[in-house]
């Protein structure tokens, strides 16, 4: 079997195709979760805690050159070490929401799998030679 034939068989197997579809849908779903976190949840969290923009929360760890604006971007461009925890808060909330949504989806899928009882396996077909041997045995008993 040639290498191309083996690759074709590998690529069209159900698991590989399912994985590819999952990655594509996961990427799109990640954008939806990012939007939910950034556009819906973080503004509410920011309103509760009095800070609407978490991306500019940071602690300066080094000396700031004179004339440098005290924004995260300006400090990073100036090479000042900063502990930028605001973006981490946003990413952590994003992860928690995504993990919870995936958990709920898996939970529902598992529930649906349990509800659908497996169809009983059909009785195995007795091979023809066994049937013939049984007939011979039964005729000898008479």
Curated annotation (Swiss-Prot):
Q: NCBIfam families under this entry?
A: mscL, PRK00567.1-4, PRK13952.1
Top-level taxon of origin = Bacteria
Name of the protein in its database record: Large-conductance mechanosensitive channel
Similarity annotation? Belongs to the MscL family.
Q: Where does the UniProt annotation locate this protein?
A: Cell inner membrane
- What does UniProt give as GO cellular component? plasma membrane
Ion transport recorded as keyword: yes
Source organism per UniProt: Delftia acidovorans (strain DSM 14801 / SPH-1)
Is this entry keyworded Cytoplasm? no
Q: Which gene encodes it?
A: mscL
Q: How does it sit in the membrane?
A: Multi-pass membrane protein
Assembly with partners or alone: Homopentamer.
Its transmembrane ranges are 10-30, 40-60, 86-106
């Amino acid at each position: 079997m040639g290498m191309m034939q083996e690759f074709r068989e590998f690529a069209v197997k159900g698991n590989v195709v399912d994985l590819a579809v999952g990655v594509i849908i996961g990427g799109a779903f990640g954008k939806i979760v990012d939007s939910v976190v950034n556009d819906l949840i973080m503004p509410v969290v920011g309103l509760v805690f009095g800070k609407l923009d978490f991306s500019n929360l940071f602690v300066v760890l080094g000396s700031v050159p004179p004339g440098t604006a005290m924004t995260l971007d300006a400090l990073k461009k100036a090479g000042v070490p900063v502990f930028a925890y605001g973006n981490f808060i946003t990413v952590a909330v994003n992860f928690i929401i995504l993990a919870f949504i995936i958990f709920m989806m898996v939970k529902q899928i598992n529930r649906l799998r349990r509800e659908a009882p497996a169809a009983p396996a059909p009785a195995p077909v007795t091979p023809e030679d066994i049937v013939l041997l049984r007939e011979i045995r039964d005729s000898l008993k008479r």
